[in-house]
């Protein structure tokens, strides 16, 4: 009887050890996958920063309605082959927002890479910063993907600054206000049409039916050569 109990206890101990080993393996696998994802996201952010830096080293109220289609659901699962590609984009300018650690190039409106699922997207109807009383409109995702360049845009408040580098000129903008807009494929822009402005648009992280619109006004411009 004693031997039977001893064998039974040994079998129980063996099963417990096996369960612990399996649990440890699952935990370690999950941890490595999580660390790998963080590392990849860091690589993407560093790559974009370097590309933007290379570009820099090279040398009355108006109401506008524009089409903006930012669907966060589309970027939850990105194809693996998409992540491995590192296209050599021909940036025409750079957007920098120090408070939320963004320094990212943007493309010509007609460029195939000018797509919210690949880059910052310059919206049709935008003016470049050198156009008098113009309005540069840029949109980006706010989710948790590696292309969610505006994931921290909600942290901006009035008087925070953003810089746009274009045609060897550094344009300094300050946040003048923000508002929510319905997420229906269009955004109505309220701005002072007697000023040069920068409009930043992204999806709300708390309300899937809304988009956040930031209006920034030009404060100064200077050569950065």
Segment roles from a protein language model:
Residues 5:
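C-terminal edge-of-domain segments
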Residues 2, 12-225:
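Solvent-exposed, non-transmembrane regions of membrane-associated and secreted proteins
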